């Protein structure tokens, strides 16, 4: 998955280069790195033929694969120093939110509460929970994992809100873990977020923490065409 991710990243960045001969020059240089990588990037850019490799200043030397150059392989399964966002609304289950927050903080994460109104929301126990951020201005991109805890009515309301749908859809697309209770399912459905091992029931705090410590790399080929 890491090679596909790298090739797709090169395609993404080079697609922003408007000058064709510059794109071709870079792909030509990639041939000195790896012929297969160059071909995948060329295909992703829609090139009909692989550009020629420029003369190498020094003859390329093949070296054995180094774990030190990996990203996924070196990624530590941890929540320490990371941040979990919990989306709530009026009527959200107080006990579920408390359990998720406790589990995330015990794992070393910071927890931020997100609500439609920055003033917070009144939970199922009748108490007002202040928010750290307003939903429209606090997208899931700022979190390492998210939880969505909503009442049935709250889920129906937020399933019609673009910011809420984007909150879960972007987290899913960025391969992040998502915890969701029954009320949140309406929002997930609106965002076309399906179940996988990284989308867990909000009551399963242990499963959520385990999933939140990493990214769901197996999800990526199901979401986008990789180079």
Q: Predicted regions: what is each one?
A:
Residues 4-173, 186-227:
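Extended, subdomain-level signal for the structured scaffold at the beginning of enzyme domains
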Residues 174-181:
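ADP-ribose/adenylate-binding Rossmann-like module
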């Amino acid at each position: 998955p890491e090679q596909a991710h790298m090739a797709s990243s090169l395609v993404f960045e080079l697609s922003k280069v408007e000058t064709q001969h510059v794109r071709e020059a870079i792909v030509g240089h990639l041939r000195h790195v790896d012929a297969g990588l160059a071909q995948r990037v060329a295909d992703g850019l829609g090139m009909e033929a692989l550009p020629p490799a420029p003369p190498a200043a020094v003859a390329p030397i093949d070296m054995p694969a180094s774990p030190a150059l990996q990203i996924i392989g070196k990624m530590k399964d941890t929540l320490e120093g990371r941040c979990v966002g919990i989306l709530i609304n009026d009527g959200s289950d107080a006990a579920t939110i408390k359990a998720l927050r406790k589990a995330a903080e015990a794992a070393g994460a910071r927890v931020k509460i997100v609500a439609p109104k920055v003033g917070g929301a009144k939970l199922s126990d009748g108490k007002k929970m202040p928010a750290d951020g307003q939903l429209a201005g606090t997208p899931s991109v700022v979190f390492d994992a998210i939880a969505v805890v909503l009442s049935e009515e709250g889920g129906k309301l937020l399933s019609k809100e673009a910011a809420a749908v984007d909150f879960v859809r972007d987290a899913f697309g960025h391969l992040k873990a998502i915890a969701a209770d029954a009320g949140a399912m309406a929002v997930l459905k609106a965002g076309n977020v399906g179940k996988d091992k990284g989308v867990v029931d909000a009551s399963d705090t242990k499963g959520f923490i385990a999933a939140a410590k990493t990214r769901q790399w197996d999800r990526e080929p199901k979401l986008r065409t990789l180079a």
